[in-house]
């Protein structure tokens, strides 16, 4: 699947001028509120006409302003999941799901009803009414309804934004299964770096209506400038589960040339995982420290130092091929005489396993 988007649109004082190309998987639009994420996904969906630009899916021109082409939203065969589930309150879960089948061409019904309800874990909900569902359950049903329409592309506009942390934790594993077990490309809108780090293959960073960066999630989310909130800056690494210590509930994850020990549930050896290390949780030392409770200490070489905010600096460290970010005070940087090329030891206080 190849999706090409070029869009210009003026909305009052706000101006959107964005372009990107996606080759499938999960492409995440990431940025602060008001950055243009929803405006852009609405143009892709056919819910809004751009003032200029084009939307092309696998060579088919869905929008091209110079040629006067605009395929209506109902003919694009895109699934759309909103912040709110928007289920029909008078229909059961089963009937809501069946409604999605009305929009699937008979020749294109690639996903069976049973497979979808198993994928989303909604077998026990089929006879309930939407009023008797939790927020997370409603969103899973809404996703199922969209999938049963056999979409060529699934658009998800902040589907977890209205949920509390417990409901988000409930639904994220199902979104991972959706990503891994179907071939449906997804455009996913979020301002949560944790969601994007866990789900996305490609990231498009938007700011003030313009694309600031685009590329693989591991590369983009490891840049200090990518975080919508400075507190969220950090490194995203890919690794493989080496082993699981049942006694201490620790997984050993092998990176390119290093290993990390991470508190986790039982993980199968050989499983690929993503690891997020917030820059605020990485301390630096110029000699290998001893007598610390920290389990993860990596040796590396400083690649770059950039000024941060409020008297801080962001330091990028190459740890045998894995890039780690550390945010420390400018005073600490001066006292340790830190500079590019110097060897340091990164003391990692917190590691988040992103799935």
From Swiss-Prot:
ATP binds at residues 31-38. Residues 291-355 form the Mop domain. One of its GO terms (molecular function) is ABC-type molybdate transporter activity. This is Molybdenum import ATP-binding protein ModC. Residues 1-233 form the ABC transporter domain. Keywords: ATP-binding, Cell inner membrane, Cell membrane, Membrane, Molybdenum, Nucleotide-binding, Translocase, Transport. The lineage of its organism: Bacteria, Pseudomonadati, Pseudomonadota, Alphaproteobacteria, Hyphomicrobiales. Gene3D superfamilies: 2.40.50.100, P-loop containing nucleotide triphosphate hydrolases. It comes from Rhizobium etli (strain ATCC 51251 / DSM 11541 / JCM 21823 / NBRC 15573 / CFN 42). It catalyses: molybdate(out) + ATP + H2O = molybdate(in) + ADP + phosphate + H(+). Its main location: membrane. It is a peripheral membrane protein.
